[in-house]
Amino acid sequence: VQHAGTEYSTVPDVQQTGNAHALMDSGLFDFVYNHHTHSIQPIEPYNGKFIAYGTGNGISESAPYENRVNNEFLLLRIQFAKQADGTWTTNDLAWAPATNLQNGGYKWCSVASDAPQGVCQSPDFDADVRERTRATVNAMGAEGAGVHELLLTQDPPLPVVAPAESAG
């Protein structure tokens, strides 16, 4: 995880991309996650792996319209798979767009295409957030590399693995 970037920008800056590429080029990481900008930023496919530059504000109060990206969030589901040679790879990366409710309270609300809880603000508002998120996430080629929207009512939940009993 790196804490870098220009606040409220939907485009990663030189510090973010330089640091993320250096981390990936080290060979020590299979996924790099960035936060700090309080805005959704692209997911970049990089040498067969992925960099998530910004997931917005998962915990937020409403921002004024000029900083509306501060009211938008991105939930990521990253599924890793162990390969036969013992290395790990990202075998599925999905995103779900979300916003807070601005009409009197702050509440996480998915604006995913399948609208699992119904309309957050209005059909037009929700669609605007969703499409702005889609365009931003895919701005560096994520969709072409298999990254997709997480449809909360259609994608099966990942299995829950119970912790092993401690011997003692």
Specify the residue positions occupied by each region the protein language model found:
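Conserved beta-sheet core of the metallophosphoesterase superfamily
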Residues: 14-74
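A short C-terminal boundary segment appended to hydrolase-like catalytic domains
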Residues: 67-168
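Alpha-helix initiation/capping motif
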Residues: 12-13, 110
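Short acidic, glycine-rich surface-loop motifs adjacent to enzyme active sites
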Residues: 1-11
